[in-house]
Curated annotation (Swiss-Prot):
Superkingdom as given in the UniProt entry: Bacteria
The keyword Membrane belongs to this UniProt entry's keyword annotation: yes
Family: Belongs to the chlamydial porin (CP) (TC 1.B.2) family.
Protein known as: Major outer membrane porin
Species in which this protein is naturally found: Chlamydia muridarum
Chief localisation class: membrane
Region span, Disordered: 85-110
GO biological process: monoatomic ion transport; regulation of cell shape
Membrane topology: Multi-pass membrane protein
Molecular function GO labels: porin activity; structural molecule activity
Length: 404
């Protein structure tokens, strides 16, 4: 039985090395691996011994904590319906007939899967050990992230077929009550966050030991709130990039006409509130200085940006009859002229107007995952753990620590 257990754990660790946000499982035997310190000798006393004090039972470990998530499996967490303008129909030729009536439509972001979600964390690790069996630990450090998904996941919308004209100067303009009426799903949205403070707390216990085998459990909670550093929208009809984007929180359509301009007011910095909890159960087996382990975990992560709406950057006043770089799309018709005395009422009908997107809430698409790793212990004082996680995420973890 012992040979079988050794073979399974060794094969799992070696076989996973080629298959490589974010919480590691950790070695279940970690509380009892480092039994000696660099400053104070370890003490393996009996908790029932009346001569034993808490000073003998408690020890401290410090180290480096690095967690690198290459792909977290996420999906949007939104309502089934989305309020915007009516869908253009075949009867709309030169311009859309109705662009001011708010209509509940099927939400294109509902149940969408993110194409890529990455998170990289570097932190200091501190653990308080009790009786060489229990750990209470925390991490303090910094994290940064990257998200990429189909534009439908971000509710990228705009107004096409606007036929409102300004009679005073015969130049077509967008009315204050105009609503976006088309959803752009054949595009990609990606965002990068800045490096923000991150922390986590947790506890780990060696529940059962038999010879060199250890069964343990752990629970962890992590939190961070990075700001969005850069937002890229890769769309043929409306392509733009925003550095340090700002938007509207709790604002329904229509957005203010100043949205996207330098004079926009009541906007907030776009940030993502990340929360995650995780419970895990793992089994390890010590082979001299190596202690491989395998574990399962249950976790729930959420990324909430308060559904902030971010408008496409544009000029407050037209220059050369344009406010954005959005292309003119004539289709089967002709390009309308929106200037001069002979201006037509649909001068903006061939160009996408009032483009915006929103950062929807996201959550874990899968709750269960697998973790495989190994710990190398030297002189019972120093340890380095390497771990990989699969199924609900593709991630790697490195932890190096020493005991005082």
């Amino acid at each position: 039985m012992k040979k079988l257990l050794k073979s399974v754990l060794a094969f799992a660790v070696l076989g996973s090395a080629s298959s490589l946000h974010a919480l590691p499982v950790g070695n279940p035997a970690e509380p009892s691996l480092m039994i000696d310190g660099i400053l104070w000798e370890g003490f393996g006393g009996d908790p029932c011994d009346p001569c034993t004090t808490w000073c003998d039972a408690i020890s401290l470990r410090l180290g480096y904590y690095g967690d690198f998530v290459f792909d977290r499996v996420l999906k949007t967490d939104v309502n089934k319906q989305f309020e915007m303008g009516p869908v253009p129909t075949t009867t709309d030729t030169d311009a859309a007939a109705d662009i001011t009536t708010s209509t509940p439509r099927e939400n294109p972001a509902y149940g969408k899967h993110m194409q890529d979600a990455e998170m990289f964390t570097n932190a200091a690790y501190m653990a308080l050990n009790i009786w060489d069996r229990f750990d209470v630990f925390c991490t303090l450090g910094a994290t940064s992230g990257y998200l990429k998904g189909n534009s439908a996941s971000f509710n990228l919308v705009g107004l096409f077929g606007d036929g409102v004209a300004n009679a005073a100067n015969a130049i077509a303009t967008v009315a204050a009550d105009s609503l976006p009426n088309v959803s752009l799903s054949q595009a990609v949205v990606e965002l990068y966050t800045d490096t923000a403070f991150a922390w986590s707390v947790g506890a780990r216990a060696a529940l059962w030991e038999c010879g060199c085998a250890t069964l343990g459990a752990s629970f962890q909670y992590a939190q961070s709130k990075p700001k969005v550093e850069e937002l890229n929208v890769l769309c043929n009809a409306a392509q733009f990039t925003i550095n340090k984007p700002k938007g509207y929180v709790g604002k329904e359509f229509p957005l203010a006409l100043t949205a996207g301009t330098d004079s926009a007011t009541d906007t907030k910095d776009a940030s993502i509130d990340y929360h995650e909890w995780q419970a895990s159960l793992a089994l390890s087996y010590r082979l001299n200085m190596f202690t491989p382990y395998i574990g399962v975990k249950w976790s729930r992560a959420s990324f909430d940006a308060d559904t902030i709406r971010i408008a496409q950057p544009k000029l407050a006043e037209a220059i050369l009859d344009v406010t954005t770089w959005n292309p003119t799309i004539a289709g089967a018709g002709t390009i309308a002229d929106g200037t001069g005395a002979a201006a037509t009422a649909n001068g903006l009908a061939d160009t996408l107007q009032i483009v915006s997107l929103q950062l929807n809430k996201m959550k874990s698409r899968k709750s269960c995952g697998l973790a495989i790793g190994t710990t190398i212990v030297d002189a019972d004082k120093y340890a380095v753990t390497v771990e990989t996680r699969l199924i609900d995420e593709r991630a790697a973890h490195v932890n190096a620590q020493f005991r005082f």
